[in-house]
């Protein structure tokens, strides 16, 4: 089958970018143009010969434009197989003329529902019915019909028509058809996502879950140079999230895959301290290696850095308030890969930009704390709710004879916020709202405790008077006894071990105050 010459075009677009110039050139190539509503007016106002779709259907647009192209003379003209003699005869018998080119983009549903306080009625009116129907009909019959949904493809179509006596190539028609089904799939998912937000979680729950991924950024590589990688916008039942919605890179080379993981880790942790005293978080390989609060950012930085004076080199630092000059000068004394803050005060950017390899990132708004987490495995996708439930001071259950002091409670709460952001098994020592020793990612909780104590001793931090947090219960008393030996005075842990009584007795024997949260924070 030879490539069909484009003689008739149906044009109906919401996004009118480039449509006048495109249709003017189509007209100059001898293409007969039919159009609808606002598009028809735009073309006619520009002096382009275009006829109403009603001249094909013999039926007016009705119901405020809801019904205009849903007609056999439209879809017959799109779906007829030109090489099928029976189709050709039926088309002729019913006064159906072939349509060779469809130029349609859809009502801006996603842009509409993204507006603040959009009404349900406005959202519903922006669900396109006729547009997707025409696109799908044209795309199905891509052997004969060229279908364009993206103004970026106008030039390609014109180029091929000029080079091929008014026809497009089979390869191009197939490529454009693929874009149609990608578009309509994404469009329907956006509608379903919006409607899911209008019903209760129980009503919306289903045995299947759909997500959409649209590439936002190409990464230089993945975790390692031999791995390809990219960052994709994600749309699920909680809406669409993208990097650019929450962050803006102000300086530095492009962000890597590992950078993105570290940014997610750093900002998820700093969110725990939104609105609190000046707080600094230092991240290395997604684990916090230093976290501290103080009366100023510069003091918080020095305290966080003192937890581990080696790991912060090449690390990621997040601040819970605008980065001021004093803190910037202190941080600038070492090389850090990424600095993240809600803003940078006057003069700070000029100072920090002198290091070309450093990335400076503004966090524009708070990250969502609820929603789903997705983890890919070779055998399927694991889905879980985010670990976003909060343990308040009132939720703590004191299980020992000694009650914790107010100062101990403050440190226990500080430690618990950090604990859930560290890879399991986690043991964390905190003193005066500063991490003193971080034991992360060990197969044995006792080993995590030993590492945390060793890290503190390496930088001469005295654990006497500190508190300890464990992301899961102590299965035996040995971990707690090791903490007591280090000088800990209070303990926070989920509880729930069959040996809780044994652990509580050990705490009482060492005059420790211990609280249970009733909530575990494993992080794999």
Curated annotation (Swiss-Prot):
Which GO terms of type biological process are on file? 'de novo' IMP biosynthetic process
Tree of life domain: Bacteria
> What is this enzyme's catalytic activity, as reactions?
(6R)-10-formyltetrahydrofolate + 5-amino-1-(5-phospho-beta-D-ribosyl)imidazole-4-carboxamide = 5-formamido-1-(5-phospho-D-ribosyl)imidazole-4-carboxamide + (6S)-5,6,7,8-tetrahydrofolate; IMP + H2O = 5-formamido-1-(5-phospho-D-ribosyl)imidazole-4-carboxamide
Q: Which PANTHER family match?
A: BIFUNCTIONAL PURINE BIOSYNTHESIS PROTEIN ATIC, BIFUNCTIONAL PURINE BIOSYNTHESIS PROTEIN PURH
Family indicated by similarity: Belongs to the PurH family.
- In the UniProt record, does the keyword Hydrolase occur? yes
Give the pathway annotation. Purine metabolism; IMP biosynthesis via de novo pathway; 5-formamido-1-(5-phospho-D-ribosyl)imidazole-4-carboxamide from 5-amino-1-(5-phospho-D-ribosyl)imidazole-4-carboxamide (10-formyl THF route): step 1/1; Purine metabolism; IMP biosynthesis via de novo pathway; IMP from 5-formamido-1-(5-phospho-D-ribosyl)imidazole-4-carboxamide: step 1/1
Name it: Bifunctional purine biosynthesis protein PurH
Domain MGS-like: start-end pairs: 1-149
Q: Does the keyword Transferase apply?
A: yes
Q: Which UniProt keywords apply?
A: Hydrolase, Multifunctional enzyme, Purine biosynthesis, Transferase
Gene that encodes it: purH
GO terms of molecular function: IMP cyclohydrolase activity; phosphoribosylaminoimidazolecarboxamide formyltransferase activity
**Gene3D superfamilies reported for this sequence:** 3.40.140.20, Methylglyoxal synthase-like domain
Give EC number(s), comma-separated: 2.1.2.3, 3.5.4.10
The domain comment in this protein's record states:
The IMP cyclohydrolase activity resides in the N-terminal region.
Q: Native species of this protein?
A: Chlorobium chlorochromatii (strain CaD3)
One Gene Ontology cellular component annotation held by this UniProt entry: cytosol
